[in-house]
Structure formats: C-alpha cells, structure tokens
C-alpha cells in the first residue's frame, strides 16, 4: 500500500508533458539555469514566440539567493531572478525582444498572477502555454498558472535539479 501511495504521489507531483506549439513559455523564478536553458531550446525550436521569466527573489530571504547552477557561464551581478533568467535566455539565443519582464514576484502564486498582468498589458492572448520549472515544483507551478489563466491549456516541460527525480524524491530530506 505504501508503494502505491508513493507511486501515485510521484505521478501527481512530477507533472510532465511533451512540448507543443504555444503562445508563450513561462519560467517561474529561481537561481537554477536549467529551466531557462530548456526554455531557450524550446524557443529555438519555435514552440513559442515569447518567453516570460518571472521573479524578484524569494519571499523567505528578501534577496536574490544567487546563481545555483552554471556560475561560470552566468556570472553577472543579478539583483533579481528575472535579471538572471533573462541573461540565461539571451546567452542561449533568445533575443531581447522575445523576453517579457516580470520582476516583482516573490513566490509561485505571484509568478503566475503577475505574469498574467504582463501578458494582459501586452495584449497577448494565452490559449496554450509551456511551463519550464523544476521537476518537483511542476504540479504546484501548473496549478497556480492554471488559476491565473483558467482558459489556457498548459504543457509542463520540467528540468531535473538537485538530482531529485520521481524515483528518488523520498530518499532525501530535500526531496
């Protein structure tokens, strides 16, 4: 019974889809480069015309916690998660005019809610979107973005960070 519980919980938390053509790619804020790198790959393959990284910093620290992966390549003096993620996107081939700006969010619901304000102000109607996030953050990100964009369809294209996967998340405190 415990194994079935873990299996079903893992399936729920670690939401993942194959990418499809979309109106935008969302990247909730953090200090990991992988999600923005994945978004840049999807942009290069023409999955969406815009990428919207979102984030000021974590509400729990009150400052940008720094670059957690890719420090050699992304060595700027970043004040916000958005500044960092924009740099990652641009260094991976996404032009500045395809990167939208949301730099006030301090937690996941704000990432989604404030991103909605940005797309509404830009006149971008979101019918389908891709979310590039941490794999163990996938369900939470999906639920918040669905709440902010109730009429949109979402594809979650997560990245593995911290070595945490659906197969091992129960084996560590971090998972």
Regions found by a protein language model. Name each.
Residues 1-173:
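A structural signal for short, hydrophobic/glycine-enriched beta-strand patches
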């Amino acid at each position: 019974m415990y194994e079935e519980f873990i299996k079903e919980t893992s399936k729920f938390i670690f939401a993942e889809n194959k990418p499809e053509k979309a109106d935008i790619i969302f990247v909730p804020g953090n200090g990991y480069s992988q999600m923005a790198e994945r978004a840049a790959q999807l942009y290069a393959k023409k999955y969406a015309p815009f990428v919207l990284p979102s984030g000021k910093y974590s509400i729990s620290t009150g400052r940008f916690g720094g670059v957690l992966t890719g420090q050699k390549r992304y060595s700027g003096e970043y004040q916000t998660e958005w500044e960092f993620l924009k740099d990652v996107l641009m260094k991976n081939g996404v032009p500045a005019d395809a990167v939208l700006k949301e730099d006030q969010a301090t937690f996941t619901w704000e990432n989604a809610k404030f991103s909605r304000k940005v797309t509404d102000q830009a006149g971008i109607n979101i019918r389908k979107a891709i979310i590039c996030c941490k794999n163990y953050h996938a369900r939470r990100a999906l639920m918040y973005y669905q709440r902010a964009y109730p009429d949109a369809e979402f594809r979650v294209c997560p990245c593995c960070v911290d070595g945490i996967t659906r197969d091992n998340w129960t084996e560590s405190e971090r998972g």
